[in-house]
Amino acid sequence: MLGYEVVIGFETHAQLSTQSKIFSRAATAFGAEPNTQACAVDLALPGTLPVMNRGAVERAIQFALAIGAQVSPRSIFARKNYFYPDLPKGYQISQFEIPVVVGGEVEFYLDGEKRSVRLVRAHLEEDAGKSLHEDYVGQTGIDLNRAGTPLLEIVTEPDMRSSLEAVAYAKELHKIVTWIGICDGNMQEGSFRCDANVSVRKPGAPLGTRREVKNLNSFKFMQQAIDYEVRWQIEQLEDGHAIEQATVLFDPDSGETRSMRSKEDAADYRYFPDPDLPPLVIADDWVQRVRAEMTELPRVMAQRFVADYGLSDYDATALTQSHAIAAYFQAAAKACGQAKLASNWIMGDVARRLNTDEIDIAQSPVNAAQLGLLITRIVDGTLSNNAAKQVLDALWAGESPDVDAVIESKGLKQMNDSGALEKIVDDVLAANPKNIEQYKAGNSKALNALVGQIMKGSQGKANPQQVNDLLRKKLD
């Protein structure tokens, strides 16, 4: 953009899918009445002590294994000191110097090209409560239900260079945490919160001053916010103004970012080890137990699809976007024995209909077995591709659950009578001598015109390949 390079890093808070909080037994369910899920520990009453939730630690280990990161054998909890009304203790329990997860990377595709973003760390911490402003005129309500909810904060290197790349990374990260079941990924409920650190610089120059963009509760808003912030920073620099480090909020209504506060550095939080919590020690046998219990990872499943089904890397990655898509593909491929065709139909015609209806594949009106039979009818010559799409339309609309019944009722069965087809071909050739002359003169489009006439004469039931073969046999 105007000779500037965009530099983006992400901090993502993934709410871990435990039933109780990270340091107490209080429930983590979303939507309860305010302050009904906050116990003495969450309220920071005198004499209470935090007790580590084993499930939160195991989910952090799962994440490390999923991204090829190192699990720290010994990590430390620290107090992050700041004052806010919805933080009863006056500090947040987090990790600073030694996090539970170190390194790793997230790989994804953008425009068919494989990309990767390196991770710095992922650390465990507790969430704060919520300040409620809308229902209180001139006052602020405090809801501590969320206080103490376990979070995994995932921090990247500043490896992304566009809003498109940033969104592709965020979608892949979202896929990973939901696939392995450590987070439900609900962005509207705040289970998956992304903050983008955005800066710009001239190519080859040192990193510019970053501004942290918050309130990115959808992938659409994420792209809009980053694009606006990049334009704003470039305009400021072009006008001779310096960029000041700050935290900004994205307003979806105006499509603009506005400053919330000056951005703090680590020193402002005065981190120090929490004396109430011992070091978190994770033995290798614990890591191996977690590994043994984990589901097949999406990248491993994608590699299997390439090896077993002969799919491309791109197709295999697309079909492992969720457990539901992968299961649907495998069931359809098994039903028809044609994995590549199943892949093409799912990524093409089925995906288009899902997008139009704004539903996911688990809600598809056409199940994998039906799609598999439909593909079988193409392979065995019963249906042409165009006729198969008409059958899919009928199945999707709920006209009948039976593939063969739809084919019969709509008269879509492909013409396999070679004698009848040859008569249609002869009739078309007799009626179109000009096209024959043009074809023999080297005009290949003339052959297409003849094919079209024959398909029309057969009411679309002729096999296009048979038609082409028969025409060439008669004309060449």
Curated annotation (Swiss-Prot):
Keywords: ATP-binding, Ligase, Nucleotide-binding, Protein biosynthesis. InterPro entries: Asn/Gln-tRNA_amidoTrfase_suB/E (IPR017959), Asn/Gln-tRNA_Trfase_suB/E_cat (IPR006075), Asn/Gln_amidotransferase (IPR018027), Asn/Gln_tRNA_amidoTrase-B-like (IPR003789), GatB (IPR004413), GatB_C_1 (IPR042114), GatB_Yqey_C_2 (IPR023168), Gln-tRNA_amidoTrfase_suB_CS (IPR017958). Pfam families: GatB_N (PF02934), GatB_Yqey (PF02637). Its EC number is 6.3.5.-. GO terms for molecular function: asparaginyl-tRNA synthase (glutamine-hydrolyzing) activity; ATP binding; glutaminyl-tRNA synthase (glutamine-hydrolyzing) activity. Gene3D superfamilies: 1.10.10.410, GatB domain, N-terminal subdomain. One of its GO terms (biological process) is translation. SUPFAM superfamilies: GatB/YqeY motif, Glutamine synthetase/guanido kinase. It comes from the Bacteria. It catalyses: L-glutamyl-tRNA(Gln) + L-glutamine + ATP + H2O = L-glutaminyl-tRNA(Gln) + L-glutamate + ADP + phosphate + H(+); L-aspartyl-tRNA(Asn) + L-glutamine + ATP + H2O = L-asparaginyl-tRNA(Asn) + L-glutamate + ADP + phosphate + 2 H(+). Belongs to the GatB/GatE family. GatB subfamily. Heterotrimer of A, B and C subunits. Allows the formation of correctly charged Asn-tRNA(Asn) or Gln-tRNA(Gln) through the transamidation of misacylated Asp-tRNA(Asn) or Glu-tRNA(Gln) in organisms which lack either or both of asparaginyl-tRNA or glutaminyl-tRNA synthetases. The reaction takes place in the presence of glutamine and ATP through an activated phospho-Asp-tRNA(Asn) or phospho-Glu-tRNA(Gln). This is Aspartyl/glutamyl-tRNA(Asn/Gln) amidotransferase subunit B. The gene is gatB.
